Amino acid sequence: MGCRWNPIGFQFSCFMFLIITLQSRSSLSLESEGFVLLKFRARVDSDPHGTLANWNVSDHDHFCSWFGVTCVDNKVQMLNLSGCSLGGTLAPELSQLSELRSLILSKNKLSGDIPNEFASFAKLEFLDLRDNNLNGVVPPELNKVLTPENLLLSGNKFAGFMTVKFLRLQSLYKVQMNKNRELSSVSADVLDCVNRKLGYCVSRRSLITRNKAKAFVLRIRATSRHYMVRRESHGKNYVVNYHPSENETSIFKRRELLEETSNLAAMPAPDTPSPSPEIITIVFPRSSGSFPALTNAKKRIPPLIPPSSPPPLPTNNTIASDPPRKFEEKSKGFKDVWLYVVIGVAAFVAMLIIVAVIFFFRKRAVKSIGPWKTGLSGQLQKAFVTGVPKLNRSELETACEDFSNIIEAFDGYTVYKGTLSSGVEIAVASTAILETREWTRAMEMTYRRRIDTMSRVNHKNFINLIGYCEEDEPFNRMMVFEYAPNGTLFEHLHDKEMEHLDWNARTRIIMGTAYCLQYMHELNPPISHTKLVSSAIYLTDDYAAKVGEVPFSGQTGSKPRKPMSGDLDQSLLPLPPEPETNVYSFGVLMLEIISGKLSDSEEEGSILKWASKYLENDNLRDMIDPTLTTYKEEELEAICDVARHCLKLDESQRPKMKYVVQQLKEVINISQEQATPRLSPLWWAELEILSSEAT
């Protein structure tokens, strides 16, 4: 059996073939324009400035991004390479650019003649070849396609009678344009006609510039004996009279007879013969309808027309000029009013936005911690002033995976690792007490004072406090800190499984710790670190020092204060150490960093006893950690010299941390910015906590 004819399938095949054909033609068109430009590039043999550097053959599909090329709908409409000092010849293939409207190649070093193909441009409107080394004869067809103002050829070496004649015509055109510009600057009294088809005119003080775009010349007649225009020249007024020839007069009269039969508003010609009318040349812009309103209409010049001549028609002229002038004045007034209205509305909207932003951030501001629900004394309430946000237990429980990820357990509290929804890691310290009755008022006051103290510290080399959590059912007291993922300094110095620290890393840790202690001691009032040891120095990914503080300091063993009167026994509160104690601890810490020995061990005893013999005899090389392959002797001497001053037994003789930083900085060239972590997750953690709190 034969196959049955399926007209629908045949039509669909034809339709797909048509689409493929159109797409291929479109791509060929795009490729052809790119290759045309490359042919022009091939004829350029000198490009001193590298103007055509991005005209690559491999990138011919993106020719619209080439220098000097302007496209519309992937079609080249303008090629502007003026002043590029290009040398070579003109490519006749440029005429294949079907949408090219402007070709500007002036102020180059192009030679040869103009190709005859340039006369076959489809839509070329402007050609500028000035100031080149072109020669030969200009194609005559090119003079017919483009007018003198749109074909610029001066500054070349063309030959031929037609070329010279065209260049002279172009020069005359420039001279005429210059004269028109001079006339545009001279104010004059011109004649405003009532009707374009009539010659009856009235005096009007204005002058329409001759060189305005789309202007043309009108011959205006009147029945008076003279046509006069008063002009200002060097501060003087004079009258110009123009006397037409007999031929012009006869032509004008025949035109007048024709107009009288076809114009209802035309006035009859005078019975008595009058002298031949005088003609002047005035420029008016092209428009439809009556002439536009002219300014200064009220300042009229006395009529120069004799009484014997017919009077002008002032009524129609007033109708033609005064209402538009008044409309322009009203329009200007309305524009000013609208301008003030728009400015006022914009200012009002801006004020609303500012108020809304302030209200939004005040609403999301950090919540202050309120007094303890069981009741606190006035001194306890005053001691608790902070600005860190309060968090919910459920949020921290989710971040810490039900508090299953334990970093380290201490005497009295446990530290958990958590991850916020944004991926930022945090450390959560939670007290070991699980019942309210076991949490004394002294513990509560110590807890709140700890939050108040740490919330005042905001340094890049400090484990900053970013939140807290307190609930009574179920009972919990927690603090949220930054997380330093690279362990502690103690682990890197004494645990062989941890990554080894070279000399530069150790000096950077020393400087970062010193900068942080100086910042804490210079606060008002000063803040001292509770227990400055190597296990309290945490390291970031780039081995920057982050000084960590003991979150729950009730178990630090500090000496108690003297009892004070009140409802709370102040002797239970630990006394924070003095800044001089931190200076002493920093001296011990520096010896531990450079030697790699424990600060205090049962086998070797105190590090001070071990290091004293080297410090007294200036035998500093034997103090260096054996695992260090290289070190800087000048920096070692500076560290040991500062350590001697920090370890003085008399607290009054110990230097301030500011002096310590200055002495170290003179030798160790590590600034405060270089000692800080390159990437700190603190701000991301705060942002995440604030956003979750607002929702």
UniProtKB/Swiss-Prot annotation:
Residues 363-668 form the Protein kinase domain. One of its GO terms (cellular component) is endomembrane system. Gene3D superfamilies: Phosphorylase Kinase, domain 1, Ribonuclease Inhibitor, Transferase(Phosphotransferase) domain 1. Its main location: membrane. LRR repeats lie at residues 75-98, 99-121, 123-144, 147-168. It is found in: Cell membrane; Endomembrane system. It comes from the Eukaryota. The chain crosses the membrane at residues 341-361. This is Protein MALE DISCOVERER 1. It comes from Arabidopsis thaliana (Mouse-ear cress).
